[in-house]
Amino acid sequence: MTNQEVEKKILKLTLKKKWFDLMKDGFKKIEFRTPSEWIYSRLLDENGNGRNYDEIEFKNGYAKNAPSFYCEFLGWDIEEHPTEYIFGNEKIITEVGTIKIFLGKVL
């Protein structure tokens, strides 16, 4: 493997169709996740340090041939206050502690 062929680090997440479509079309630039052992195992290493990803792969469902797309991974944060977000015609109100994953451009 040459320096130019460095393997990309990809965070893989599954979405429901309405959120998948809003993200794929560029309207929703934040993915919200309820805190859980599973999501923290993806975002933190065994020492509790944040993992770095190059991209996120979003799939609509769990089937092997489920629709998918990639976007840039810009980092993540934890919601400190209940906040209202509007994406297209959809409204989300987050709770304190909700994990926010920030998306860059769709690739």
Give the label of every model feature segment.
Residues 2-107:
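Structured alpha/beta reader/binder surfaces that contact nucleic acids or chromatin modification marks
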